[in-house]
């Protein structure tokens, strides 16, 4: 469902304010409120909204784009900055980011387009630290500036002089500017953290929460501190390398080594085709590495091409940062709790110490069923690794320190809701509450019915279902459509005003005007999803059944002649519609405004007849616009890539589907080509 203009604008404002807050703390208070991954995810979300809703984006900022974090360069607050600010001799920009091999391919393709093919590259570790620029005059270190906002940096020379990894003198008499990263050794950080934590004041947790934050705090302290001797430094850039006859990155690194600087680990890559292989085999999570990295930097080896490739206001085009996504993150199980689903399925879950994984804050994760707990031997207090399964649902993967004993969480015997004894499935993997009167099962069924996967009654969310159930107003689906009888009671509730109650009741009434497949899907019939619900309604219409009661009268054995309906699915339908409670529900819905409705495919032309299409990436208009356009001209929308696909329509940031289409020799087109097909 597409967002309204007002909701799009609200989302833009919300994301912009959040990112402004994060920037303020990062640039002015030397602390990160969120992880890099979380920040990048929110920034990318705002960029996507800007690209997809340009009109709303322009209206929010009224064309004064300096108010947007996407356009704003200077994030330093005049009133907060106490260190002396100085202008960089050359812009100290950040790196553009790549999150996939497709992003990297676009980076190398751009280089090939502008300066030809067959280039060599340098891949170096991207240190998770504080960027620094060092100025040497007549061989003596005279100034050290942080990146700041890329235009102005803070003068931290007094503390940089105390960092052992930074040579105070070098054998270069010409003025030279070098850039790199200040960071904390992980072993030293943990050792010092344990030693000094108790001596800190009330801000101790902030000061020692991450190595980078602590390094930043030390480096930017107003007075010279001995603590700066704890810090380390890698240098990887020479500003204006042509002044020193440096023509390649490889020569530049050799030059820095000779001058006594430490360098991040790097690899020389002969051509772009080897980049993906190197990254695939690179150990991003290496226990032997004594510093934090958050990716790899890919740089064109030929320095003479850098100016030709140009820059944006935020980054240069000659280099890019490949940001790896962590597969796992370590945390601790604080508690184990159980939930009951709408079918009575028992799910075990872990309450976790909060961590961030791939841009998401995670406080809980699924443990699936008891068999899963037993196999991994999980218990409260254990340190575990978690991952985001399918990039959606966090789950516990394994213990940090495997056990040999039987010290793991015991299975529950009774339903946490109705207290009835639980039953095991035949294979002894899952537990179920079979009590038809279980309150939690009923609540979950109601929640599913009004959810996005069901009837999409947005104003009637899960919290309201719980409240109305507790009040006794909504015990079953029929009660939702009788909620208008509780109008006066609703007005007495806290935060329920006349307008909001009227909107709620209007949306409930409005939900009756729905295609029947959506109603069937909302009923939560076992083994029957949206696709089969659509097919069922189409078949019922073909059999000249014209009202909702047809669902009760239809001979479901006739479905045997349709390939998509196997015996298990047919049995599920027969069982559901034979149940007295369900039959009463259908009769109620039929008598209260629900009709048997089928989605009609409006065909404007047959120009795309029997041609299959799949859309990937961000297009000029919402995807639904193009999907409807294809269907209206006789085309078919596919849900996945296969050899049967005729066309892949590609927008910005297309992802892995584009590569898969190339491998299968599927024709790749853009939205302009689609429009030409319809002329």
Swiss-Prot record:
EC number: 6.5.1.2
GO MF: DNA ligase (NAD+) activity; metal ion binding
Reaction catalyzed: NAD(+) + (deoxyribonucleotide)n-3'-hydroxyl + 5'-phospho-(deoxyribonucleotide)m = (deoxyribonucleotide)n+m + AMP + beta-nicotinamide D-nucleotide
GO biological-process terms attached to the record: DNA repair; DNA replication
Gene3D superfamilies: 5' to 3' exonuclease, C-terminal subdomain, BRCT domain, DNA ligase/mRNA capping enzyme, Helix hairpin bin, Nucleic acid-binding proteins
CDD domains listed in its UniProt record: BRCT_DNA_ligase_like, LIGANc
Binding of NAD(+), residues: 36-40, 94-95, 147, 181, 299, 323
Residues involved in Zn(2+) binding: 415, 418, 433, 438
Keywords: DNA damage, DNA repair, DNA replication, Ligase, Magnesium, Manganese, Metal-binding, NAD, Zinc
Domain of life per record: Bacteria
NCBIfam families according to UniProt: dnlj, PRK07956.1
Family: Belongs to the NAD-dependent DNA ligase family. LigA subfamily.
Function summary: DNA ligase that catalyzes the formation of phosphodiester linkages between 5'-phosphoryl and 3'-hydroxyl groups in double-stranded DNA using NAD as a coenzyme and as the energy source for the reaction. It is essential for DNA replication and repair of damaged DNA.
Name of the protein in its database record: DNA ligase
Organism of this sequence: Mycoplasmopsis pulmonis (strain UAB CTIP) (Mycoplasma pulmonis)
Gene name of this polypeptide: ligA
